[in-house]
Amino acid sequence: MQTYNWPYKNELDITETLSCDVLVLGGGLAGCYAAIAAARRGQSVILVEKGATARSGSAGTGFDHWESACTNPCSTVTPKEIAEAYVDEQCGYSNGIAHYIECREGYDRLLDLESFGGKVRDTDDEFKGAEFRDDETKLMFAYDYKNKFTLRVWGSTFKPALFKELLRLGVKVLDRTEATALLTTARNGKKHGAGACAMDVRTGKFYILRAKETVLTMSRPARVWLFNPDMTGLCEFRPMQSIGSGHAMGYKAGIEFTMMEKSVKGEFSAAGRSFPPYGAGNNHNTWYAATMVDARGVEIPYVDRDGNELKTVSERYYPAPGQKFFLKGGVIDLSLIHI
């Protein structure tokens, strides 16, 4: 029997204390932007990521579309219109403030990514003349080809570009380091954040991270919804590393949660209906408008808001007569809703 040698040194008996102005927990897309924003303002920043920041999180492997870019030069809708539509789609039970910020600043953040080295436009004219491309700006669009507020992008270039910008700005990145608990302190009788504890997942080294401000960007629980021991890996279509540890840490530290009583239809996590992340086709977002067949091989018809069959692929990308726009891919229940 061959003995396996752990390739990393044993640092279980080592504790290191670090201090900073801003501590960011989670190195996904949101965490990288938070760290960059703080560093741009002259703050000392530490970012903690349990994986490798250059490829971690939901955006790590890349994605093909950027939603809510309502201020791009080709858009015919306003941030207010789309933000209100997102809230209405959830029957009013959603965070309208966050949605408005998303719609008002989404394109600005995409321009930031482009300046960092991410590929946003069809600069090589690979899709020149395509129905979903604006030949003047070289921007490309998904879903609603009339209103043009969702962009097709080269998402595989984004996380590496963000990682390089973090290093350029002097952010201290602790990769392969799992945050385990939030630190708090009492000020004038009220609890305030004071940093976090973390552990190197390879060496066991323990960190005490002291910070004036702590930003929690550790995604949402995804792997906890499928209550079937035979299908533990089928956690909907989000990263299986999104296990809700940030929520657990926040709860233990006394953070207030909102809308926890809300529930939505389990389209991706209902027992027997889940699949490995993007392991099967669906028309909910990335594969939208692709022609589908049922188990018999019979084509499944697309219909518009009024029930009219859309017989060509092109028709599926435009609002129905009298319909201003439609949403796709930007809300929890990704049904095709019509305004």
PLM feature segments, named:
Residues 1-22:
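Extreme N-terminal leader/targeting segments of oxidoreductases
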Residues 22-47:
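N-terminal Rossmann-like FAD-binding beta1-loop-alpha1 element of flavoenzymes
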Residues 23-25, 210-219:
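Short hydrophobic core segments
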Residues 40-60:
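Glycine-rich FAD pyrophosphate-binding loop
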Residues 67-101:
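Glycine-rich active-site loop/strand segments that organize a redox cofactor
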Residues 109-210, 221-228, 268-287, 293, ...:
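Conserved redox-cofactor binding core of oxidoreductases
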Residues 216-275:
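Glycine-rich loop(s) and the adjacent beta-strand/alpha-helix scaffold that form part
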Residues 249, 255-337:
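An anion/pyrophosphate-binding glycine-rich loop and adjacent beta-alpha core
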